Amino acid sequence: LSHVLIIDSDAVVFTPDYLSTYWEMRHVADVVCGSIQSPTVCPYGCELRYKYEEAARNVRQMVYREAHPYAHLSTFNILFHRDVFDQTQFDERCTEYGYEDALMGLMLEKLGLTVEHIDNPLIHDGMDPNAVYLQKVETALRTLHHLGEPMHSASPLVRLVRRIKRWHITPLCRLAYRLTRPLLYRQLMSHNPSMTCLKCYKLGFYLMLDKK
């Protein structure tokens, strides 16, 4: 067995040449990363996850992924050389949802292993209901808080939290979150959730974790 192909349980193969594309590209790098495509129609009640995935489309463009091969690695759809997979594995600290992909990217970069991004998509068919997805977001933030370095330095959210601390406005931001959390929650549970509200919710939630 020379290679290990990882496909997420929520992924759907929809192109006839999916496997042959990976086979032809298997020697171009230590790790070959395919792409993710959202469903064409948003399932009712799953607008939050759907809009998040749509907003993430820009960083999933091939030109961006090629420019940042480690930062936007995704194990949703990925081919490892067997020796590389045995050498890296997944971080054992990630026992819950979130950040295993980011940590894998950091590990591959640290080891000097090569990553090639290709246009070989799978459809992400696991659109969670709004409340379920927000619970996953909270779990991922707890995971991030627990991980420490080097993940913290690589996280835009943690870097923002550090700036807030330097500006000495952390108590004010926590108060704003406590006051607006019910409104943010209702907005995120609506059929037209705002990604700006999601960012504010994540920042406030993380600041409260940091308080503990």
Regions found by a protein language model. Give the residues of each.
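Acidic donor-binding loop at a coil-to-helix junction in glycosyltransferase catalytic cores
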Residues: 96-104
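Short beta-strand-to-loop acidic/aromatic patch adjacent to the donor-nucleotide binding site
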Residues: 2-12
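Short, flexible, basic/aromatic active-site loop/helix in glycosyltransferases
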Residues: 51-70
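Conserved nucleotide-sugar donor-binding
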Residues: 74-88
